Swiss-Prot record:
Function: Catalyzes the hydrolysis of N-formyl-L-kynurenine to L-kynurenine, the second step in the kynurenine pathway of tryptophan degradation.
Family: Belongs to the Cyclase 1 superfamily. KynB family.
Any GO BP: L-tryptophan catabolic process to kynurenine
Native source species: Geobacillus thermodenitrificans (strain NG80-2)
UniProt protein name: Kynurenine formamidase
EC number: 3.5.1.9
Length: 209
């Protein structure tokens, strides 16, 4: 019997926090059965960076790829989940004891965003020198349980740019509280948004072995 899939996505409703100033999430029934005679039809309004989502390079680089141009293979396949104990930053020192050999997709639990009904004021961030360190091991995707890989006040977004330079894609806003460290199969496909800078995903893990 295969292991069950574990949902690691944030639930999307009107209570989900968004970046200050960004588009709030809303869902409403635009057309109900009484009006249509047959079906309910809903309408969603949201940012491309609400909840669990991927960043396309166009998010931080005007010349970068859009969501539709991304290789779907990046978001499906073996992944390693690691736990860090509420670090101030996520850098080489924090990962030195972690075996990364053969890891293509690295998902990091920090436990730093405990109340997901409010947007955090500060978060641990990816230290840019970590990017070439991960590239050396062949990592192509990094996922975190935070809304960004950079400090929330950053305008230069050094981690975004350095990860991109090293060919490492970004998955943000994961829910990993209920996931033990180890090796899993990941599925976190973006929507086929032609011009978008990011996309919500339904991310899930299945224990390997």
């Amino acid at each position: 019997m295969m292991n069950p899939w574990i949902d690691i996505s944030q639930r999307l409703d009107e209570h989900i926090p968004v970046w200050p100033g960004d588009t709030p999430f809303s869902y409403r029934t635009r057309w109900n059965k009484a009006e249509s005679g047959s079906v309910n039809v809903g309408q969603i309004t949201m940012s491309t960076h609400t909840g669990t989502h991927i960043d396309a390079p166009f998010h931080f680089d005007n010349e970068g790829k859009r969501v539709i141009d991304l290789d779907l293979n990046i978001y499906i396949g073996p992944a390693r989940v690691i736990h860090l104990s509420n670090p101030k930053k996520i850098g080489i020192d924090e990962l030195q004891t972690i075996d990364l050999h053969g890891v293509t997709r690295l998902l990091i639990y920090t436990g730093a965003w405990t109340n997901r009904t409010t947007f955090p004021e500060t978060i641990p961030y990816i230290d840019p020198p970590l990017a070439p360190y991960l590239k050396k091991y062949g990592v192509r995707l990094i996922g975190i349980d935070l809304p960004s890989v950079d400090p929330l006040t950053s305008k230069q977004l050094p981690a975004h740019h350095e990860l991109h330079r090293c060919g490492i894609h970004i998955l943000e806003g994961l829910v990993l509280d209920h996931v033990s460290p180890g090796d899993y199969e990941l599925a976190a496909l973006p929507l086929p948004l032609v011009n978008a800078d990011g996309s919500p995903v339904r991310a899930a893990l299945r224990k390997m072995g």
